[in-house]
Design a protein with these regions (language model features):
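Divalent-metal coordination cores built from histidine and acidic residues
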Residues: 16-18, 22-132, 153, 157
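Histidine/acidic residue-rich metal-binding segments in metalloenzymes
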Residues: 107-133, 139-189
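Histidine-rich, glycine-flanked metal-binding segment
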Residues: 1-19
Length: 189
């Protein structure tokens, strides 16, 4: 419009591109140091660069990976502050190892699945957006484990995401595995 709106401050953006902030939905977070910090001031610079590129929110915990409990990570980010908003997915692999399943080719026991589901439910309650799986990296996961671990998302109204089991000729079957999980639990994929 050529009419200047009434406002406390008007910014002349003529000839500029104005858009909402971008979301980086696939970030891998850095580990928490022994002093309880994630990023030094120098390391925080990457988030300043992201902001200059227009990214205002970054999502970590992708591919089933977390460097620590993702809800604890969010608490540290809230405490220390970053130039962009950070959201987290609860990475299945971290919770699987935390429950005692270290063999990526082997199945999880019923008690390990129950432990994962309980801990992931807590992470969802504490602010995680959903659960991520790195099915390709944990080939021992089966449909029973997928649904058991994803089940807390149903109660919390959260989503699942994954690096699927395979690609190329097997990509459709791999995608269907994840979609079937969402369909069984009535949760977004």
């Amino acid at each position: 419009t050529s009419d200047v709106p009434a406002a406390d401050q008007v910014i002349d953006a003529q000839g500029k591109i104005v858009c909402p902030g971008f979301l980086d939905i696939h970030m891998h977070e850095d580990p928490v140091e022994s002093d309880g910090k994630i990023y030094s001031d120098d390391e925080k610079a990457i988030f300043n660069c992201m902001l200059r590129m227009g990214v205002t929110t970054a999502v970590g915990g992708n591919c089933g990976e977390n460097c620590c409990n993702p809800a604890d990570y969010l608490d540290i980010v809230d405490r220390d502050g970053l130039a962009v908003n950070v959201a987290m997915l609860a990475g299945h692999q971290w919770f699987r190892e935390h429950a005692g399943t270290v063999d990526k080719y082997g199945p999880a026991t019923e008690s390990q699945k129950a432990c994962m589901a309980r801990e992931i439910g807590d992470a969802l309650d504490r602010g995680c957006l959903g659960v991520s799986f790195g099915i390709r990296y944990i080939p021992g996961i089966d449909m029973d484990e997928l649904t058991a671990v994803a089940a807390p998302c149903q109660k919390a109204g959260k989503m699942i995401a994954a690096h699927i089991r395979s690609d190329a000729e097997e990509v459709f079957d791999a995608g269907c595995e994840l979609m079937e999980t969402g369909k069984l639990l009535h949760i977004p994929v």
